[in-house]
Structures are given as structure tokens and as C-alpha cells.
Amino acid sequence: MTTLTAQQIACVYAWLAQLFSRELDDEQLTQIASAQMAEWFSLLKSEPPLTAAVNELENRIAALTVRDDARLELAADFCGLFLMTDKQAALPYASAYKQDEQEIKRLLVEAGMVTSGNFNEPADHLAIYLELLSHLHFSLGEGSVPARRIDSLRQKTLTALWEWLPEFAARCRQYDSFGFYAALSQLLLVLVECDHQNR
């Protein structure tokens, strides 16, 4: 990626972590349809690989603004996709895709991070990977830790995530009939792919 700064990428990862970690509340629902978010989406679209995914997400957000009982319906989508059995869902855990659930714990230790007691999910939840990537990108921008060390850890995290993210995103597309989380997962997939290629 060429036009986005490390801090901007960190913000995108943190935002996605938040959206994949819990159902949207009324305030978040208002925020994603705001003029401020439209500006943010314009910035993201300046990165050509992200353009189509951001356009699709904006289309889903526009549809959301006219959806009856939008918050409740989106909450039902969230529960159906991420909290039910894996038969017709896209569970947001590395272990659901036969990946080593201990890998993220090792990466967190290497980064000097621990999971928050406020987040009542296993450590291999997608949001934890995204928070770690956000932290690493912020650290790259600060310059307090050698960039080579941070970049090595970033690549390890991206590699571990990439082993199951494509299947997760495919399941989101398959089972999210409204398409908000499908669009969100597609944006994440493209972002991670670009980040991974940007060695």
C-alpha cells in the first residue's frame, strides 16, 4: 500500500476489530453512515486494491440506512454468522478452521500484549488478530521499537491470519444474505492481502 500511513492502516484494523467483536449499537450504526465515515471511505478508496471492497461496503451501509429495524436485524445477522454453530455460519476463530489456536497467544506474548478481561472470547478470535495488527502498525509509526522487529512480528501475524481468513470471508459471503458482514470481511481480506504483500 502506498498512500495510507501506518497509523491509518492501524485505525482501519482497530475499526474492523471493533465491528467483528460485538453487535453494533445505535451510536455505531449512526457513525458508519455519517459524513465523517464517508470521508474516511474516500481515503481508503484512494488505495486502488481497496476501492471495490469499500464501494460494496458503502452500498451495504446505504441499504442498512433504509432497512427496517436495522440495528435489530444487523444484530440477528451478527448472531447467526458469528455466534451459532458452524453449519451455516462464519465462526470468527482460528480454531474453527483447523488452525493452531495457540499461535495468536505466542504472537501476543512476543508483542508484549495480553487480552483484555473485558473481552469474553477465546484468544484466537478474529478481533484479537486485528487488534494486534493495529498495535503493530501504530508501533511502526512511533519508531520506539526497531522497525525490523515489528515488521517481522507483523508478517508472522499476517501469515497466521491468512491461513484461515479466506475461508472465513467466503463463509461470510455464503451465509450473510443481507451482505453487511460479507462486505466487511471482503474489505478485511483485501486489506490483509495488501498488507501481507507490502513487505
Swiss-Prot record:
Signal peptide stretch: none
This protein's record includes keyword Chaperone: yes
BP terms from Gene Ontology: protein complex oligomerization; protein folding
GO cellular component: cytoplasm
Keyword line: Chaperone, Cytoplasm
Any Pfam family: Nitrate_red_del
InterPro entries: Chaperone_TorD (IPR023069), DMSO/NO3_reduct_chaperone (IPR020945), HscB_C_sf (IPR036386), TorD-like_sf (IPR036411), TorD/DmsD_chaperones (IPR050289)
Subcellular location(s) of the protein: Cytoplasm
Main location class: cytoplasm
Disulfide bonds: none
Protein function: Involved in the biogenesis of TorA. Acts on TorA before the insertion of the molybdenum cofactor and, as a result, probably favors a conformation of the apoenzyme that is competent for acquiring the cofactor.
Family affiliation: Belongs to the TorD/DmsD family. TorD subfamily.
Matches recorded under PANTHER family: CHAPERONE PROTEIN TORD, CHAPERONE PROTEIN YCDY
Protein name: Chaperone protein TorD
Organism: Escherichia coli (strain SMS-3-5 / SECEC)
